[in-house]
């Protein structure tokens, strides 16, 4: 799923050449989601793409549903808009929000667990500002709507939910509620490890087990 380095950061002043970030997003989607992508993706069980936003997808593995959402850093494309039309950037961010929330709401209720993946660290970049919206596109928290939606989703499904993201440095995990866990995957700025994630039965509970693929040891670092 796209992240800020692939499009939202392409207008930075230290880059040569610099690009309009919205133009880069169109280019990126054309490059990524072609016939070869679909040929491989369609080998996944129950693979689907969101018709209105093809980067949002879902599939199943071992009765766990995997869901991708397009949530990029810079508060999902709302901050540091340096070369694009800001009002158009805000409108597109609002559309992404609506599509993402709709896609999450369509999760298959028969799955035994859910893995939800996106690029932005919506937790570390938390602010005290209100959620971004059509009526408040600036001086707002572009990630609040997702923190709230994911918490509500986990509370509704009553099944294990794992949120996977990147964006910030630490390789860590954090239980957010009884059945909601986040994993900040390794790999920002440098390769450090590969996370192996399993859904395991422990007594009467089904929980996520996250281990290092290199050492086999469990991930004990807690995200702050």
Language model region names:
Residues 1-96, 177-201:
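Extended active-site neighborhood of metal-dependent phosphoesterases/phosphodiesterases
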Residues 67, 83-176:
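His/acidic metal-ligating clusters that form di-metal
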Residues 169-224:
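Binuclear metal-dependent phosphoesterase catalytic core
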């Amino acid at each position: 799923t796209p992240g800020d380095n692939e499009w939202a950061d392409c207008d930075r002043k230290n880059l040569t050449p610099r690009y309009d970030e919205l133009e880069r997003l169109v280019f990126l989607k054309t490059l990524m989601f072609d016939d070869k992508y679909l040929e491989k993706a369609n080998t996944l069980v129950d693979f689907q793409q969101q018709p209105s936003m093809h980067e949002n997808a879902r599939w199943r593995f071992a009765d766990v549903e995997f869901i991708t959402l397009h949530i990029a850093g810079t508060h999902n494309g709302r901050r540091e808009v340096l070369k694009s039309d800001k009002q158009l950037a805000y409108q597109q961010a609002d559309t992404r929000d609506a599509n993402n929330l709709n896609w999450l709401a369509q999760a298959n209720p028969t799955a035994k667990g859910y893995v939800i993946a996106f690029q932005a660290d919506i937790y570390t970049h938390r602010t005290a500002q209100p959620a971004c919206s059509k009526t408040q596109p600036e001086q707002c928290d572009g990630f609040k709507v997702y923190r709230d939606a994911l918490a509500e989703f986990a509370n509704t499904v009553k099944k294990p939910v794992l949120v996977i993201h990147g964006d910030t440095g630490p390789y860590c995990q954090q239980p957010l509620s009884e059945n909601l866990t986040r994993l900040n995957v390794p790999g920002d700025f440098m390769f450090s490890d590969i996370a192996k994630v399993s859904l395991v039965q422990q007594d009467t509970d089904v929980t996520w087990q996250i281990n290092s693929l290199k050492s086999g040891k469990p991930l004990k670092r807690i995200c702050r």
